Amino acid sequence: MSRNDQEPFLVKFLKSSDNSECFFKALESIKELQSEDYLQIITDEEALKIRENDKSLYICDRFSGTVFDHLKQLGCRIVGPQVVTFCMRHQQCVPRAEHPVYNMIMSDVTVSCTSLDKDKREEVHKYVQMMGGRVYRDLNVSVTHLIAGEVGSKKYLVAANLKKPILLPSWIKTLWEKSQEKKITKYTDVNMEDFKCPIFLGCIICVTGLNGIHRKTVQQLTAKHGGQYMGQLKMNECTHLIVQEPKGQKYECARRWNVHCVTLQWFHDSIEKGFCQDESIYKAETRVEAKMVPDTSTPTAQSNAESHTLADVSHISNINGSCVNETMFGSTTSKLECSLENLENLDISMFQAPEDLLDGCRIYLCGFSGRKLDKLRRLINSGGGVRFNQLNEDVTHVIVGDYDDDVRQFWSKSSHRPHVVGAKWLLECFTKGYILPEESYIHTNYQPAGIAVSDQPGNQTAVLDKSGSFSKSALVPAERLQQADEDLLAQYGNDDSTMVEAKLSEALEPEVGPCPGSAHREPCDDSTHISVQEENKSSVSHCILDDSTVREEGLFSQKSFLVLGFSVENKCNIVDIIREHAGKIVSLPSRIVADYAVVPLLGCEVDVTVGEVVTNTWLVTCIDNQTLVDPKSNPLFTPVSVMSGVTPLEDCVISFSQCVGAERDSLVFLANHLGASVQEFFVRKANAKKGMLASTHLIVKEPTGSKYEAAKKWSLPAVNISWLLETARIGKRADENHFLVDNAPKQEQVLETKIPNGVSSNPDLPAHPDAHLEIHRKKAVTPLDMNRFQSRAFRAVISQQRGQDPTFPPVRQPLTKEPSLHLDTPSKFLSKDKLFKPSFDVTDALAALETPNAASQKRKLSSPLSEVIVRNLTVALANSSRNTDSHSASPQLKGAHLEEEETRKPLDSVVVCVSKKLSKKQSELNGVAASLGAEYRWSFDETVTHFIYQGRANDSNREYKSAKERGVHIVSEHWLLECAQEYKHLPESLYPHTYNPKMSLDINTVQDGRLCNSRAPLAVSASKDDGPDHLSVEGNETNTMGTNDKESPLLNGSGRDDCKGALTQALEMRENFQKQLQEIMSATCIVKTPAQKTCMSRSSCNSASSTPDSARSVRSGRSRVLEALRQSRQAVPDVNTEPSQNEQIIWDDPTAREERARLASNLQWPSDPTQHSELQVEIKMPDDSPSRKPVYHSEIAEQASCVTQAPGHPGSEEPEPPVAERPLIPEPQAPAVASPLAKPPVAPQPADKIETQEETHRKVKKQYVFQMSSLNSQERIDYCRLIKDLGGSVIEKQCSDPSCTHMVVGYPLRNEKYLASMAAGKWVLHRSYLDACKTAGRFVQEEDYEWGSSSILDALPDVTEHQQKLALAAMRWRKRIQQSQESGIVEGAFSGWKAILRVDRPREAGFKRLLQAGGAKVLSGHPEPLLKDATHLFCDFNKLKPDDCRVFIAEATAQNMVCLKTEYIADYLMLESPPCADNYRVSEAALFHNKKGGPGLPQKRKTPAENVVKRPRVH
């Protein structure tokens, strides 16, 4: 429907069967004004075919239905017929609105909304715009009407003073409904007075101090004008309190609850003026002047009392008189209550202090009675303080009047001493509006003599822990006394930091208690700590400083907080912490919108509006790093969603690594809440004496560290933090395979806290993997944390004694107020004219650091050294040279940068597990496997590829059955030993678990690709630096060109020429070598199938320069194997030597020759096409190629767009030499396809070539059902999301599915999914197809991204010859089957076959699915009628009883059925022409066939033409 630029503007009328009369009037009116050439009348069907916004004007009669929604989604300009008639009548232009316009009833109306919820506001906006009106979110002079949900907002007050109509949302709804019914033509046709906003809408009014008549009048008028009257004052419900006089209980509560306290005049003026008045004008307040004279004529006793200085007061104390600081007493004014005149007559309402002034203060009153006590109680309640009726250790302040002996006894006995102050401190705090330092108001009876408050070590706890007033104190420096009373100082000498640390630890502790069953609950000192560096505060805070300075320059200055969901004690602690860092606390109810709501880790209900909801973990992290951290940078900073009532991790024992600080504490709590047991040490076996359980999971951030290595060694899952969060979210144990830390990209740290100033909560420190930049915390793992010491010299000495390099962490920013207070550092006032050089006696310091828990803290995190020497020395040596760089999963270009790579070992991709039956040899066999590059497992798991077992053919051993069901290789121990002796990856089928070397045939002459793929080095060139590129021709699966490890990373022009010459030379060498091998094969007496000859012709030996390995690990037993392993590395065989030259010349034994032929045919390819074949180690993945280069999937798409696809033989094309000009940009680790598409496509964009409507319709209905194979888990997740976003579906099965239409594979493998897709003629695509779909935003054409197309194979230099055959075969079958389907014949690759399967049961289902995918009919059972109908019999008698096999084959041969090996199925698909069936005939069937056709047996014999297996009718 697109039009040319010269085409004029079109008006399209959408015609339907129920068009109204107005529709036809509009059509006639436009016809009178404009030519019919510019008018179009379209139907609903034509409208649905529109695929883009063609800038036309659409006239729709109904603003609902499928057609309207379709045009609206395309962004078309839509108006109703009433708009056309209105514009014609008034000679106006049709409005150019981005939204549909139904009529013009509100054409000159501009609306703004206030006090409406989001859904209601959006509904009002939609209706106004559809009726031709305009909408402004802000109130300005253009607004004509205000739509209000309730009164009292700023918009409401401004609009009311400007005399603008303030209406209800129902006015808009009524206009829309009446316009639909064609009852109105203008908004003025509806009476606005009926929809005027009531004066007190949304107000809940309560009164106090009014008489009965006035109260009754207020109640009636409130209900009449839309308000609600309430007799009782209720918190969070009442909005206004009408006050006669500003006093009374209701008034006090209303002020505390932020209820508007207004006079009665406010009520009457609101009714008189017609709108709710501003409450601030009518605020009920007390007079400023306070009554200082009693109401009665009788004077009080204290009114005439004289003030005395403390020097004039005689007081006897039990404190040593020599410790009295006379200077302090002489300069201090009276603190006694005698100076507080008229406390009984004090008017509390005169104070204008904030309602949360005393928040966090727990106050005990003593020595007061009567009206004084009542006044102080009311004062404390109005300030938000907590009053205690009994004196205990939770009290932070004691306000004393008369002397109280109970307080004195508590003071002398308790180690926790609250501030004992007079009532004047409380009154002056209310007068100034903030908490004043208590030191100046401490009662003389309860003040330690001679020790300034700032210098008391023990008092730091009280100062910081209780009121947070330490940083606000106006401290007076005093001379420190040389000697004091020993008994008194003993109370303060305990410099135990745990008292200080306990507070923030309690604040961090979530509200849910510890779960039972936890193996090890984290101790208190492993929670969030405040460092002992806080002691320095007393020495740097000797300046008199105003409170406002601290509040303005603190961490949380100008930030408001709302604390919800915590217990009273924890809430008080958190409030103190926030206030200490200049934050403001918002109490409920309040109209202030807090910046942050601090809630527990598991969250709580937040029913008020706040900026962001954060957890206490975020709060502690901000304090640790002294900066405001982004709450979105870590999922623990916001409430974690947890399914309640379930504990999915009850049987799990979890250990954490690389998690420190508040993050670790939160994760430990979360794990305990989910039922898991958390323990510090990561152990494999339980130890009841030490209270340790066997670990089941390790949660780690990065795949490094001793715990991670132990997890890999023990085959325990090492997952990231996301696993724990996902388990909490879904309420069941998440799949660990999706969250393995190995699968996560290195550059992506999901839970790493990103700090703006560069301080990270998890810095990467290789020397100290557990080091963490935090101030208030000790490490939980490291027994002796060097980073806790400030002295670099001290840390250096400790490092030398521990045998480590003195690696110092980055400079840390301590949590102190010095930067904001602009104070000098301690070094400046310790001594101004001397350089401070501390010296340490390291011996004494280290001895002092020893604690009773040191022994338990120094437990080894790994196995004993003796065990490592005995079992793992070879493993360490093998792993030390292993290349750990992870390759991209995408095809990569040839580049000039060549990385040095160690020679790969024979069993690099193998994971072995030794049966418990061979437990005595397990350590020895594991060592042999590790020396060959294989990994080993102590217990069988899903990662094992080879199970080493020795037993009978049909053994009933449980381990054997499990391994057999998994489909892994079950081999004899001799296979591993022979691999070590030959230093080759020998075929597994030659060494079954029943293998007995004394009863086995000599099969050294039978070699397939893996035998020749020897890792033993061959010296092709003696030059190490300047020689030509080495030729590396792998076996039947590898055809890659390796380059010299010492080659220059950049290729200039001459380098390219040399490369081309070397490449040509290498090809010639390979060709000559293949000819030699063919001659050798033809000369031998062994009968080989053509497929085997092809395999042997491709075989070659790996050539690379190497040197013998040094020092193998010492092992007991089988030294012959290790000695042979060393000698095999030094041996340099001749390239031109035939494989059988080293054998003795013997006579030709026909039976032995036949057995060798049978074994050689088994070596050709594994006969199991099921999903387990993906684990076959003989399939060499492209990652093994040493010349792997990065390539972009987008480059493949670009190449595919400009390549004319022409079928050609892959063997005729020469490999492309490396191109230096190609950009060497590495590909990302994983495809970034997780983000949803910006605009989901409505339909695919039109193709370049012209298509008929029928083709387009068929294209739209094309199904996209995907399956994936040989992709890693992250790619599967990302691609699944992309496919679903594009409208396709994904089948996540491990086996093939007939409903699949597209198969996306990483690399072609001879497995069930790939072969079944090939047999069914389905699309077999490269992963770059999905990347191209993501770029285009739709499913694109598949031809250029199909495996086998030149655009894919040319861009993938490391595709082996075997993979290339598979790719070309898939494309060939797809074209054949599609051509037959287009001609009306629905067939597959096996159409016409009627097959019977005689294979072992675990593999039968895979073969059945494969045959059925290709159109074959699989017959079950073997009755004689079925044998008559069947055409093929596929047998694999290795695991079946020989007697049954012979009987069955005899019956099948009698019915002239073709009895073939299962390998025939895969080769039938792969080869261009059908393979010869005789080469795959079962040997037993051949014997019966010969007997049957012998002389004297006149039975029917097939002609040679009939002996060939039928080819299906697919051309």
Curated annotation (Swiss-Prot):
SMART domains per the UniProt record, alphabetical: BRCT
GO biological process, one term: homologous recombination
Modified residues (Phosphothreonine): 298, 782, 851, 1064
Keyword annotations from UniProtKB, A to Z: Chromosome, Cytoplasm, Cytoskeleton, DNA damage, DNA repair, DNA-binding, Nucleus, Phosphoprotein, Repeat, Ubl conjugation
Region (Disordered): 799-826, 880-901, 1020-1055, 1097-1119, 1203-1255, 1491-1515
Residue span of motif Nuclear localization signal: 1510-1513
InterPro entries: BRCT_dom, BRCT_dom_sf, BRCT_TopBP1_rpt8, TopBP1-like_BRCT0, TopBP1_BRCT_1
Biased composition (Basic and acidic residues): 1023-1032
SUPFAM superfamilies noted in UniProt: BRCT domain (SSF52113)
Ranges of compositional bias, category Low complexity: 1097-1116
Modification note: Phosphorylated on serine and threonine residues in response to X-ray irradiation. Ubiquitinated and degraded by the proteasome. X-ray irradiation reduces ubiquitination. Deubiquitinated by USP13; leading to TOPBP1 stabilizion and activation of the ATR-TOPBP1 axis pathway.
Stretches assigned to the BRCT domain: 101-189, 195-284, 353-443, 551-636, 644-741, 902-993, 1255-1347
Main location: nucleus
Gene Ontology CC terms, in alphabetical order: actin cytoskeleton; BRCA1-B complex; centrosome; chromosome; condensed nuclear chromosome; cytoplasm; male germ cell nucleus; nucleus
Family, as annotated: Belongs to the TOPBP1 family.
Assembly description: Interacts (via BRCT domains 1 and 2) with (phosphorylated) MDC1; promoting TOPBP1 recruitment to DNA damage sites during mitosis. Interacts (via BRCT domains 7 and 8) with (autophosphorylated) ATR; promoting activation of ATR. Interacts (via BRCT domains 7 and 8) with (phosphorylated) POLQ; specifically binds POLQ phosphorylated by PLK1, promoting POLQ recruitment to DNA damage sites. Interacts (via BRCT domains 1 and 2) with (phosphorylated) RAD9A. Interacts (via BRCT domain 2) with (phosphorylated) TP53BP1. Interacts (via BRCT domain 2) with (phosphorylated) HTATSF1.
Record protein name field: DNA topoisomerase 2-binding protein 1
Species, as recorded: Mus musculus
